[in-house]
């Protein structure tokens, strides 16, 4: 399955909630009707969604939020299930500790897609070493930084400004003047914002 490159707002409308796929410069709710499905007049149906359909939609929503394809998502779930603790929470923690997501959470990219591009274009270092794999798992204590030649990019400066206005997660510490941040610890479930019901995904894969 190829990565989706179409309109980001369409995906949020499909899920009926803002997936934060676009910059926070303007609220997505101001741009489109999130309660209206994609299509000229919005797709309507009187049929009740089945339990399976609800579970599948939740999985699709989380995949789209983090920009992960099906095969990779299955691997994340298998690893989450293998680890001790709550499988659903483990899954979200694995997704949150992806390098592209951490770059986004630190405010170096205004969206996860932009953060993923920064990583792919070798604009990011981890502990002083260039890292260009978006799915790299970041560990507690790792230092993430913007490379010197990328510090003047307008999109990074703008993203940092937006992040400072909106606030940063407690599990990262960022020095915006140095363009670097520290992944202090794995986030707790309560630290992960967003309208996500991970238990539905666990139920889906438990069928």
Curated annotation (Swiss-Prot):
Ranges of compositional bias, category Polar residues: 42-53
Chain ranges of the S4 RNA-binding domain: 97-160
GO BP annotations, alphabetical order: ribosomal small subunit biogenesis; translation
Disordered: annotated segments: 31-55
Domain of life: Bacteria
Keywords from the UniProt entry: Ribonucleoprotein, Ribosomal protein, RNA-binding, rRNA-binding
Keyword Ribonucleoprotein: yes
GO cellular component: small ribosomal subunit
GO molecular function, a single term: structural constituent of ribosome
Pfam families, A to Z: Ribosomal_S4, S4
Signal peptide (residue range): none
Keyword Cytoplasm part of the UniProt annotation: no
HAMAP family per the UniProt record, alphabetical: Ribosomal_uS4_B
Family, as annotated: Belongs to the universal ribosomal protein uS4 family.
NCBIfam families membership: PRK05327.1, rpsD_bact
Function according to Swiss-Prot or TrEMBL: One of the primary rRNA binding proteins, it binds directly to 16S rRNA where it nucleates assembly of the body of the 30S subunit.
Subunit structure and binding partners: Part of the 30S ribosomal subunit. Contacts protein S5. The interaction surface between S4 and S5 is involved in control of translational fidelity.
Protein's name in the database: Small ribosomal subunit protein uS4
Species the sequence originates in: Paraburkholderia phymatum (strain DSM 17167 / CIP 108236 / LMG 21445 / STM815) (Burkholderia phymatum)
